[in-house]
A protein has these predicted regions:
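A glycine- and Lys/Arg-enriched "phosphate-lid" helix/loop adjacent to the NTP-binding pocket
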Residues: 79-129
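Hydrophobic/aromatic beta-strand patches that form the interior of the parallel beta-sheet core
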Residues: 3-5, 25-27, 84-86, 133-137
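Glycine-rich phosphate-binding P-loop
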Residues: 1-21
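Structural motif
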Residues: 6-9, 66-70, 88, 137-141
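NTP-dependent small-molecule kinase module
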Residues: 123-159
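Alpha-helix boundary/N-cap detector
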Residues: 42-45, 108, 112, 145-148
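Short, well-ordered alpha-helical microsegments
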Residues: 12-14, 70-75, 93
């Protein structure tokens, strides 16, 4: 059974899939399961299906990535579903903004990240949910794909 991972914007989900996609089974619910309306807002009618399909995907995958939004995380929390959450320290805001500019993210998305970065990190820090295992990426250049926790997990799959 695989683990469920939620990652803050810019924590390296796409990079991780590119590097490890041929070594382990990765399912990306963010890309694979419909969750939003045409206008980009989360559709509450799709949320139950999203959670159920994500849980089913853990049976055939080593890692399942889920959406970072509070709505999705709250749905997992309400159902007491364990997941790992990777997020940066507030001190890394400029690094994350710069990386999004380099990646050529849409300007409005960069503005949203810039405007909400500290608030989102504070919300995660304040979250006391028992089934959310938080991993703060405090060091410059530290992302999902190079954290010891994930590396140990990947190594354990090979055994």
């Amino acid at each position: 059974m695989g683990i469920i991972v939620s990652s803050f914007i810019g924590c390296g989900r796409e990079f991780f899939k590119n590097v490890y996609g041929d070594k382990i089974k990765i399912f990306d619910a963010v890309d694979e399961i419909p969750l939003t309306d045409i206008d980009g807002k989360i559709n509450s009618d799709l949320l139950d299906g999203y959670v159920n399909e994500t849980l089913n995907a853990t049976n055939n995958s080593d890692i399942v990535f889920i959406d970072f939004s509070n709505t999705v995380r709250n749905a997992f929390n309400e159902r007491n579903i364990d997941y790992d959450l990777f997020y940066p320290s507030k001190e890394r805001k400029n690094e994350f903004i710069e990386n999004q500019v380099i990646k050529r993210t849409k300007p409005k998305d960069i503005q949203t990240l810039d405007r909400n970065f500290e608030k989102w990190v504070d919300e995660i820090d304040d979250d006391k949910t028992d089934n959310c295992y938080k991993h703060k990426l405090a060091n410059k250049g530290e992302f999902i794909g190079n954290t010891p926790l994930i590396m140990q997990y990947i190594d354990s799959l090979k055994q």
